[in-house]
Amino acid sequence: MNKPHRVLLALVLLAPKLAQADSQWVLEQSTLTYHVSHPLHQIDGVSHAARGKGVCHAGQCDFLIAVPVKSFDSGDSNRDLHMLQVTRGAQFPLVSVRTRLPETASASATIHADLEIEFAGQTAQYKQVAFQVVMQGNQIRISGIIPATLSDFKIDPPSLLAIPTKNEMPVRVEMTWRPQ
């Protein structure tokens, strides 16, 4: 085999290795809590079912997090069923969140992330959402609040006794990530 063929063979064999990510992260544990307010009561729906992965390459990390809509539990099965109907959960069963962060972000006590959230068949952008970052050994714990609203996703506010809920639907995020 002559030298050009050896170089070509080496490039073909090494190219997949060179294209791989520098590092990867996996979501180990999560608690996502949405809050809806009505003049007669307050509602919190909690999910621990989020899955996520982060892939870092060339100093940037791309994260994707997904959670089934039906995994949120408010403590009232009738309310949860109505939430699935209002959010079109049968047609759009997942909430997904995408963000890109610099690989050095984990060294900060606070990060500001631009989020793209798909929910109920709609996509909303949230700029510079603050999250607190705590390193625990090789794990990174993040927490913060996404300032979501029902109107961001074209969801009509549910009503009780002809009184609609407030438009605000903040989502509290608590996640633990570890290197893969």
Predicted ranges, named:
Residues M1-L8:
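Bacterial N-terminal signal peptides that target proteins for export
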